[in-house]
Amino acid sequence: MLVLGIESSCDETGLALYDTERGLLAHALHSQIAMHREYGGVVPELASRDHIRRALPLLEEVMERAGTAAGDIDAIAYTQGPGLAGALLVGASVANALAMAWDKPTIGIHHLEGHLLSPLLVDEPPPFPFVALLVSGGHTQLMRVTDVGVYETLGETLDDAAGEAFDKTAKLLGLGYPGGPEVSRMAEFGTPGAVVLPRPMLHSGDLDFSFSGLKTAVLTHAKKLGGANICEQAKADLARGFVDAAVEVLAAKSLAALKKTGLNRLVVAGGVGANRQLREALSAAAKKRNFYVHYPDLSLCTDNGAMIALAGALRLQRWPDQSGKDYAFTVKPRWDLTSLAR
């Protein structure tokens, strides 16, 4: 089965072709970072317009690279939610227009399910069941993943997502956009232990997270150091303190989730899953505590069409009736992942 995947939930336009026998054939991605940088964040209207401009050229690119024609495609999967409403509508419209023209069925995919399943795109995919740490700019959750469509929330953030805390810390320190990579880069030059920040909910006894207090601690510390006049080394030390605190909490909660479930396999997904410090901490813990940890390829940590094509293919293998040719669609800017059970 050959599935075309289309991702357009926020500020990346991604298209990909995934075959259930041959794997990922091709994927192409356009990031809008440069366009949104001058605004310091994503502007929804600009994001939607750019998805319109990029979708068809990316389609031509992936089909050429995969050596496929429209007649070879069995179904089209697209991100139905959650995300920015206008951006989602662009991807859904493109998917259903192509499907109507080519007489193909479509299937709407949950964006976070795509992230959860993205580590299955590696050469040696993790078997079910596993614990997943889903950590991005909009979400921070620990999930028990029993199979495709069978998800249980073990813990989640009570306020800011981890990626949001990274971005806000970058703004507080006067760093560039996107903030997450900039904070991580600056932290590389920080002195370990020079700044020690609180570890919110580290000992709460549950698997939930909170990052708003950590963000406030960064603000308070930055003001003490001179606010806008803070020197570069002080910025680096503060960035290091922030990253160390965030990573320690994420790693500790992940280990607690493995202990609670009795599972020995952890999957890390989402944009923050590309963070080097987080990967190193979890990999070191895996060696010490004898469990397995899996990551998607760095190129697939960000939003992408490959994960949507994969999720669509896996769902259609299990439940062929989930696709259709009526081409009447809705998008779901807010959508609970656990509602997908089946």
Swiss-Prot record:
Protein name in UniProt: tRNA N6-adenosine threonylcarbamoyltransferase
Pfam families, A to Z: TsaD
Gene Ontology MF terms: iron ion binding; N(6)-L-threonylcarbamoyladenine synthase activity
Gene: tsaD
Catalysis: reaction(s): L-threonylcarbamoyladenylate + adenosine(37) in tRNA = N(6)-L-threonylcarbamoyladenosine(37) in tRNA + AMP + H(+)
Residues the entry annotates as binding substrate: L134, V135, S136, G137, G138, D167, G180, N275
Record-linked SUPFAM superfamilies: Actin-like ATPase domain
One of the GO BP terms on file: tRNA threonylcarbamoyladenosine modification
